[in-house]
Amino acid sequence: MKILLFICGEGLGHTGRCLALGKEFLAAGHEVNFGAYGYSKGLVQKTGYSAYEIPSEIKLAGEAGTFDIRKSIKETLNNLSPSGFRKILRLIEKLDPDVVLSDGYYTGILAAQKRKVPVYFIGHQFNMEEFFWKKGLFAGIAGIFVKRFYNYVFSSVDGIIVPDYPLPYSVNRKNFTISRAVNDNIFFSGPLIRCRYQEAGEKAFKRPNVLSTIGAFGYRAAVFRNVLEAAKLDPSIYYTFISGPEIDPEQFSKVPENVEFTGFTENPFPYYKGSDLVITAGGHGTIMESLAFGLPILSFPDEKHAEQENNASVLEEAGYGKRMSYLTPPEVILACIREIFEDENYSKKTRRLMELAEVLDGPAAVRKFLEEKHRG
């Protein structure tokens, strides 16, 4: 098969799981092309693959840890143009794929349908209208149109691939609101992780080690500061901070001896394997990677970001970690870290998810799913 993968560039989770799929399809002898933009395209290239430049689409905006729906709508609308759609049409015509996989990139779906190429949506969020609730008249009207558009997409694609654990273990279950009419087109693949646990190297950290990752958005730096202050309160717990592309570690002064800043890394998996707990935002991709490596999570979701808040709530309710806040002070952060280390039930549950991720083998499951549907 000739596979074309379109990647949404807002959040590295989209890129990570598409790289996992690309690796799997290539290993099985299929032809793979990537379409990406921004730092997602850069990560694809740093991993060793070529990528075609595609127009950016959805733009997320916020400040001081709060998601700004109005600003996000404005920046997204400014990005959209007929010329961008025509560019995607030409790319599909040039590459002539047998199947298009579109991870959160909706222009790719519409263009594939225009070219009559089978297209599958990869996504973990299906209640986008929640972003627009109680945000004023403008946002409310926008939410109505957004819901209609997404409902069209979900009902018109050839299939929906959900890169999460199947129910009842799904982290995205509060974000999963799809009409029963499309149930037959939904496939829970399990986590799509670039590196399996057995294949990953392991960083030789002093233990216990807390891995703190801020993802890709610079306005999350407030969490770094609070976690850094928490680290100063107990030197017997070690911390490793992986910063996102927009964070300069040099901005943090007076770093204690039990803290290490690594800057941004394209390969976080040895860090996961060498750690005992992950502190992250509420993004689905990092949560899946952490759980697939058996790690409990302290999740700091972006405020007013419904999807992340739902993910964090599920983590707490299921006993995989705790939902935190940008207002959580360092003393309470430390108390939560100690609680997770002292209560073995957290690690027992997340180790079970690590074992389940190995059994499900998400990338291979997607490959087999598509090979079955598109034989010959």
UniProtKB/Swiss-Prot annotation:
Superkingdom of the organism of origin: Archaea
InterPro entries noted in UniProt: Glyco_trans_28_C, Glyco_trans_4-like_N
Cross-referenced SUPFAM superfamilies: UDP-Glycosyltransferase/glycogen phosphorylase (SSF53756)
Keywords, in A-Z order: Glycosyltransferase, Transferase
Gene3D superfamilies, sorted: Glycogen Phosphorylase B (3.40.50.2000)
Pfam families listed in its UniProt record: Glyco_tran_28_C (PF04101), Glyco_transf_4 (PF13439)
GO molecular function annotation: hexosyltransferase activity
Keyword Glycosyltransferase recorded: yes
Enzyme Commission no: 2.4.-.-
CDD domains for this protein: GT28_MurG
Residue ranges of the TM segments: none
Class of enzymatic activity (EC top level): transferase
Similarity field: Belongs to the glycosyltransferase 28 family.
Entries under PANTHER family matching the protein: GLYCOSYLTRANSFERASE, UDP-N-ACETYLGLUCOSAMINE--N-ACETYLMURAMYL-(PENTAPEPTIDE) PYROPHOSPHORYL-UNDECAPRENOL N-ACETYLGLUCOSAMINE TRANSFERASE 1
Record protein name field: Uncharacterized glycosyltransferase MM_0582
Organism this protein belongs to: Methanosarcina mazei (strain ATCC BAA-159 / DSM 3647 / Goe1 / Go1 / JCM 11833 / OCM 88) (Methanosarcina frisia)
